């Protein structure tokens, strides 16, 4: 998410106005100065999210994994991303509007890849930068194209310093402040 705002299609304020008037069936994001349409999740996407939700509830009942949370991301919070999941303390988003700041409380952003043409750039390139620039401690990418989970952590100067990928079936360590291990054996049911 590096291009300067002078190359943006529109301002954040213009994006938010468009997003407010979009039908509920259309999910919009503003990533890297570009308006993005996020694919609607298929059944496997939803099942994988529910698997992760159960794991989070089991290991960290003090946290909520919020689906489809709108976050202010990138440098100076000039981007708007709608995560597949946002892990934060229970009650953290109480009173928040459509787009929440990530300045405190957001522990992890989660994306589950969709089968569309923009997945590579959006989930594997742009979002790791935007989430790191926003200071989100952990980014978990569940990649259905290559049956892996990638954990990004330790954001500094707009980049995650640590990146580790695991195949479906491995035990996946989520570092502090998340601080638990995922048993991913069940994800083999969704492998190619």
List where the protein language model places each region:
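Gly/Pro/Ser/Thr-rich low-complexity, intrinsically disordered segments predominantly at protein N-termini
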Residues: 1-192
């Amino acid at each position: 998410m590096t291009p300067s705002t002078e190359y943006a299609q529109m301002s954040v304020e213009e994006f938010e106005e468009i997003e407010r008037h979009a039908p509920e069936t259309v999910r919009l994001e503003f990533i890297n100065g570009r308006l993005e349409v996020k694919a609607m999740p298929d059944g496997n996407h939803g099942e994988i999210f529910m698997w992760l939700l159960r794991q989070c509830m089991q290991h960290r009942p003090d946290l909520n994994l919020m689906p489809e949370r709108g976050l202010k991301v990138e440098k100076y919070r000039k981007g708007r991303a709608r995560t597949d999941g946002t892990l934060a303390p229970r009650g953290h988003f109480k009173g928040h509007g459509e787009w929440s700041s990530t300045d405190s409380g957001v522990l992890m952003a989660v994306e589950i890849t969709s089968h569309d043409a923009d997945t590579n750039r959006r989930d594997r390139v742009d979002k790791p930068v935007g989430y790191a620039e926003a200071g989100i401690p952990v980014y978990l990418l569940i990649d259905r194209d290559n049956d892996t989970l990638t954990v990004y952590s330790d954001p500094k100067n707009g980049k995650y310093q640590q990146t580790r990928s695991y195949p479906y079936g491995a035990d996946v360590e989520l570092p502090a402040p998340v601080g638990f291990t995922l048993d991913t054996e069940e994800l083999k049911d969704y492998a190619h």
